[in-house]
């Protein structure tokens, strides 16, 4: 019997537990004390970390491997990537590679590596003092300021002019090392690829919808994006070049890019499970359980035949609400009854306090939809937007 080690599970990683069981594997998990109780009865063994930093995730993963050698290892989210990469490398089991894990975890390392590889990406500067980067930034306005290792748009903001740059430099003076980039115009997409021994088994392009500047919070995703075959082929070639530069071996890749008149321009890459229910969207779109596919790769199992194309079209809607105290919630049950809605939920209720939206953490719920064609999906998505309302004061 094989053993699958999950470094981090959370809520959205629970399908990995089911996937391991479906494949007949024992499942061992490393999780924080805060979330351990919710999964304790679902795994064969549980290692509780002493915190949620990269270092303490690694400590937990090292302890798990010392007690029992797994046959496969999966990192759930961003803070677990380095821990999983190190034990995958140590054990010689399938994984992205330690190099890919390190690059994935640091956006400044990505910029340096991809500049050397000739990958199209924004002009950039790594700074310890934003104010000291003023001359460079003012020559390239608008610019984007972002931290090196956060996810979910946290700390990302567009700076449109000189006055705004001075304000941001003062406000973020004690934040430490930051990345400053020339802003790139063009619609946002992501490229999800399952990779085995450096070769792409299958890839999908997802269209993103964001709030735009200054924080670019993602509010909707549409898998099997409506782009031409030529554009898709160009994106696949671009993705393959990025994988080669990253040193990617085996596992899941989530690559974010903007599509410009000159072609794709890289925003960032991550070698872990994408958020915003993209795995569920991929399953709905192509008729395969992507959590099980990732587990198969991790355990060295055979994969089924790759999909020939979408069997339906899927989207996620991740609503925001005006900052304040929630006074009423309308339409949730009606949304759940819609024939195109697969799942719908809200994370707020009456009297909840909603902070001003600066990152994905301030979104108030999720709706997953699937339909037989794009027009039906868009009509359903529009109806959900009209129906689901969170009122605040």
Q: What would you call each of these model-derived segments?
A:
Residues 6-15:
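Glycine-rich adenosine-cofactor-binding loop
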Residues 13, 116, 133, 295-393:
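Peripheral (often C-terminal) accessory segments that flank ATP-dependent C-N-forming ligase machineries
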Residues 1-4:
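Extreme N-terminal starter segment of soluble prokaryotic enzymes
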Residues 41-126, 363, 376:
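Conserved N-proximal alpha/beta basic substrate-recognition cap immediately N-terminal to
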Residues 30-37:
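Short, polar loop motifs at secondary-structure junctions
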Residues 64-70, 137-140, 173-175, 246:
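Glycine-rich phosphate-binding loop signature in dinucleotide/nucleotide-binding domains
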Residues 105-185, 196-199, 221, 225-237, ...:
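Active-site nucleotide/adenylate-binding loops and adjacent lid/helix of ATP-dependent enzymes
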Residues 182-248, 252, 259, 266, ...:
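ATP-dependent carboxylate/phosphate-activation module, predominantly the ATP-grasp catalytic core
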